[in-house]
A protein has these predicted regions:
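Short helix-capping segments at alpha-helix termini
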Residues: 117-118, 140-145, 220-223, 250
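Proline-aspartate-enriched helix->loop->beta-strand connector
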Residues: 224-229
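S-adenosyl-L-methionine
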Residues: 1-138, 142, 194, 254, ...
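A SAM-dependent methyltransferase catalytic signature shared across enzymes that methylate proteins
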Residues: 144, 242-256
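Short internal loop-to-helix segment that lines adenine-nucleotide cofactor pockets
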Residues: 68-99, 148-149, 158-161, 166, ...
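Short strand-turn motif at the edge of the Rossmann-like AdoMet-binding core
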Residues: 128, 206, 230-232
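Hydrophobic packing residues within well-ordered alpha-helices of enzyme cores
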Residues: 112, 135, 212-216, 241
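Conserved SAM-binding strand-loop segment of SAM-dependent methyltransferases
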Residues: 144-152
C-alpha cells in the first residue's frame, strides 16, 4: 500500500509543476499578455506572447519572467504610488535621467520611462544577460526608446573583483578573488561616461546597497537625486546606509509598507535632499490602506523618518 502511495505522490509531483504553469499561462492569455500598473497612472505593458508548449515545459527565458511580471503591479504598491506622485507633481524633474540598478525584469524601468521627457533616460543596470535580453524585448514590444540597458555589477569603484551567491539572475554580490569573479563598474563611471544628469536613483542590489552608493559619490554631490533603496532590517544595519546619505545632506525615510513576495523584514527607504522640501504626497486613512493594496508596517504616516 505504501508503495502505491509513493508512486502516486511521484506522479502528482510530476504533474503539479506543468499544471501550475498552464494555470499561469491561462491567466496571461486571458489578459492578452497585457499588464496594467494601476497605481502608476495605469501604464499598460505588453508582454512577449507565449505558446502552450512554453507553459507545459517552462521553456525559454520569457515564461518565468512573464509570470513574475503579473504580480509586479501589486508589489511595493506604496513605493510605486509615491514615485508616481513625485513625477506627476513635478517634484522630480522629468528631463533628468533615472538610475535603476538591479533592474531585474525592468518592471520599474519600463514604467518609469513613460514619466520622462526631453533628454531623460532610464539606465537599467543588471548583471544578468538573460534579464536584459528579456527587458530589451519588452522595450521593443512597447516601443520604448529612452531606456539604456547596461550589463554590469557596480560597487564603490571600478575594477573590483566580485563573486556572487545564488544565480546571476538574482544574485547577492561580495568581494572575491575567485577565478569566476566579475569585474565591477560604478554608478559614477556609467553616469559620467554617458553625460547624464540624475533625478532618481533606485538601488535594489540584495545587500550591496552601501557599496553601490559609495560608488555614486560624485553623482550624489552634483545632482542630489531622490534615492530609493531596499534593506532587510533584521539582517542589515540600516544606519550604515542612512548615515552615509545623511553625510551628503539627505533625510532618510522608511516607506511604511510590508512588501509582499519578499522576506518579512524587507523594507523600502526613500532619501530626500535637505535643501528641498519633503514632497507633498496624497494622504489616506491608514484604515483604508489594505483596500488600496497596501499592508502598513507600523501605525503612522506613509513615510517614517529614521
Amino acid at each position: 500500500m505504501q508503495k502505491l502511495i509513493n508512486i502516486f505522490r511521484k506522479i502528482q509531483g510530476l504533474l503539479s509543476a506543468p499544471l501550475h504553469r498552464i494555470a499561469n499561462y491561462t491567466r496571461l492569455r486571458g489578459s492578452n499578455f497585457n499588464i496594467t500598473f494601476k497605481h502608476e497612472g495605469c501604464v499598460d505593458v505588453k508582454l512577449p506572447k507565449l505558446s502552450i508548449i512554453n507553459a507545459v515545459f517552462g521553456s525559454g527565458i520569457n515564461f518565468s519572467r512573464n509570470v513574475s511580471y503579473m504580480s509586479r503591479p501589486n508589489a511595493e504598491v506604496l513605493l510605486r504610488k509615491l514615485i508616481f506622485e513625485m513625477y506627476k507633481s513635478g517634484y522630480i524633474n522629468k528631463n533628468l535621467s533615472i538610475v535603476d540598478i538591479g533592474s531585474w525584469i525592468s518592471d520599474n524601468s519600463i514604467v518609469w520611462a513613460s514619466y520622462l521627457s526631453g533628454s531623460g533616460h532610464v539606465l537599467a543596470i543588471d548583471p544578468s544577460s538573460d534579464n536584459l535580453k528579456y527587458s530589451k524585448n519588452l522595450a521593443n514590444i512597447n516601443n520604448i526608446k529612452n531606456i539604456n540597458f547596461i550589463e554590469a555589477v557596480c560597487s564603490e569603484k571600478p575594477g573590483m573583483k566580485l563573486d556572487f551567491d545564488g544565480t546571476i539572475d538574482h544574485a547577492e554580490f561580495k568581494v572575491s578573488e575567485s577565478k569566476n569573479s566579475i569585474e565591477s563598474s560604478s554608478i559614477d563611471k556609467i553616469v559620467y561616461e554617458g553625460n547624464y544628469e540624475i533625478g532618481l536613483m533606485h538601488v535594489d542590489v540584495e545587500g550591496f546597497e552601501l557599496s553601490v552608493l559609495q560608488g555614486s559619490e560624485s553623482v550624489l554631490k552634483r545632482d542630489m537625486p531622490v534615492i530609493s533603496f531596499e534593506q532587510h532590517i533584521s539582517r542589515e544595519d540600516v544606519s550604515k546606509v542612512s548615515n552615509y546619505l545623511k553625510n551628503f545632506g539627505y533625510r532618510v525615510f522608511m516607506v511604511n509598507e510590508v512588501l509582499p513576495f519578499c522576506d518579512k523584514d524587507c523594507r523600502n527607504f526613500l532619501a530626500f535632499p535637505v535643501n528641498k522640501e519633503i514632497p507633498q504626497l496624497t494622504k489616506f486613512n491608514q484604515a483604508d490602506a489594505y483596500s488600496l493594496g497596501i499592508c502598513s508596517a507600523v501605525v503612522g504616516e506613509s513615510l517614517i523618518e529614521i
